[in-house]
Design a protein with these regions (language model features):
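Extracellular parallel beta-helix/beta-solenoid repeat domains
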Residues: 1-153
């Protein structure tokens, strides 16, 4: 996927989803798992997502509002401190070629695993737009496992 404005995949389903063997070069988040439990109620939180064997190449090069990480997970809910809107997301065996360090940004998630067979490679292909230095940003989450990531830095 490339040349798509704003984001790549917008996911929302309680059924099992497997995202595998894709190429992402997107101006915003490559994968956005979002929900609206506040106004439109358009989709539910996810319950079982596997993201594997994908190449994420230099995402988030567009407008700063288009993405907060290669994989961004959140929800439009007012009570973020106690809600765990999305559950059971596994990221395994992917390659992240990034100029922006933000790989994953999560809030309101219960159950997330980033396995050690993911590879992170840094590029200088674009100027960094964010001041964020962390690869993994989590807020109001439970049961988050970030195994030792592989990196060339």
């Amino acid at each position: 996927m490339r040349g798509n404005r704003a984001r790549g995949l917008l996911l929302g389903s309680r059924n099992r989803m497997v995202i595998e063997d894709n190429y992402f070069h997107i101006a915003g988040a490559a994968i956005l798992i979002e929900g609206d439990a506040n106004y439109w109620y358009e989709q539910s939180g996810v319950r079982d997502v596997v993201i594997r064997r994908n190449l994420f190449e230099n995402g988030n090069y567009g407008s700063p509002g288009w993405g907060s990480a290669c994989i961004a997970v959140g929800s439009g809910i007012p009570d973020r401190e106690t809600s765990r809107y999305h559950r059971n997301i596994r990221v395994e065996g992917n390659t992240f070629r990034v100029f922006d360090p933000r790989i994953v940004n999560l809030y309101c998630v219960d159950g997330f695993v980033f396995t050690q067979d993911n590879v992170i490679e840094y590029t200088d292909d674009y100027p960094v737009l964010s001041g964020e230095k962390r690869n993994f940003i989590t807020r109001n989450c439970d049961n988050i496992v970030i195994e030792k990531e592989q990196t060339d830095k």
